[in-house]
């Protein structure tokens, strides 16, 4: 498979042969597992206090009193300790020692990344994911390495406009909305839309230049993962590769 390399002005500079990773088999099931594995690896353990509801000297009266044989507090008849009692323990409490991480085999994870990279070259998948492609002739977009040294938002805005992906950044900006439900009070007030992903051979300042654009993520090719390529487990993210990143991809994730 061949692809054009664009300059920062949006003009075709040359044509290169894409590595075999872009022809990998499409496996949405593996991609989903790899993304969920990455998400659950960040989960903070939570659980109830093991002593909750048990801090009492309640003791049962036994039979023969015409009342339920449940533990009752001393100097009174109020039930305690048991799950059905007010202030009693929980029947099956959450436990902090539970491991929430859903693991995945190393070879499967690498296969998932390769498959997600190949999905970025499928125009139909990228469109179905909701990205605005406009007049784009090819996906993924490959740009010259000079972009790695761009350090300002103004410059990156002009480059994205020249490459034809700024409409998708606008979509991400307009898609920010307040979350429904209790999550608003738990540090995740807004739901945000993912825009283009920029994969670079090395970071010489481009992260500073692109971080202020809504929905844009920047990553070096060595740190590429399934969650960046398929946010929310949905493959086909609009992706911009630098030429050096494409060259390095051929020897990674094997």
Swiss-Prot record:
Protein name stated in the entry: Large ribosomal subunit protein uL4
Record text on subunit structure and interactions: Part of the 50S ribosomal subunit.
InterPro entries, alphabetized: Ribosomal_uL4, Ribosomal_uL4_dom_sf, Ribosomal_uL4_euk/arc_CS, Ribosomal_uL4_euk/arch, Ribosomall_uL4-arc
Family recorded in the similarity comment: Belongs to the universal ribosomal protein uL4 family.
Coiled coil residues, start to end: none
Presence of keyword rRNA-binding: yes
Function: One of the primary rRNA binding proteins, this protein initially binds near the 5'-end of the 23S rRNA. It is important during the early stages of 50S assembly. It makes multiple contacts with different domains of the 23S rRNA in the assembled 50S subunit and ribosome.
The keyword Ribosomal protein is assigned to this record: yes
UniProt keyword terms in alphabetical order: Ribonucleoprotein, Ribosomal protein, RNA-binding, rRNA-binding
Species this chain originates from: Methanobrevibacter smithii (strain ATCC 35061 / DSM 861 / OCM 144 / PS)
């Amino acid at each position: 498979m061949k692809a054009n390399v664009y300059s920062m002005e949006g003009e075709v500079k040359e044509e290169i042969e894409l590595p075999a990773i872009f022809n990998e088999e499409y496996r949405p099931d593996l991609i989903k597992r790899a993304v969920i594995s990455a998400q659950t690896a960040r989960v903070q353990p939570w659980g109830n206090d093991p002593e909750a509801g048990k801090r009492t000297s309640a003791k049962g009266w036994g039979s023969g009193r015409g009342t339920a044989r449940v533990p009752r507090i001393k100097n009174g008849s109020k039930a305690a300790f048991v799950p059905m009692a007010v202030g009693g323990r929980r029947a099956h409490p959450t436990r902090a020692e539970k491991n929430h991480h859903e693991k995945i085999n190393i070879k499967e994870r690498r296969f998932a990344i390769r498959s997600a990279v190949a999905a970025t070259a499928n125009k139909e998948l990228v469109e179905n994911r909701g990205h605005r492609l406009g007049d784009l002739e090819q996906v993924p977009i490959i740009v010259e390495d000079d972009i790695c040294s761009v350090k300002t938002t103004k410059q990156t805005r002009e480059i994205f406009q020249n490459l034809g992906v700024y409409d998708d950044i606008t979509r991400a900006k307009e898609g920010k909305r307040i979350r429904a439900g209790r999550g608003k009070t738990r540090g995740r007030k807004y739901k945000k839309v993912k825009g283009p992903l920029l994969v670079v051979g090395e970071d010489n300042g481009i992260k500073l230049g692109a971080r202020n654009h809504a929905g844009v993520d920047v990553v070096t090719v060595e740190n590429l993962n399934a969650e960046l390529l398929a946010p929310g487990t949905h493959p086909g993210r609009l992706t911009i590769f630098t030429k050096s990143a494409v060259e390095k991809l051929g020897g990674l994730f094997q």
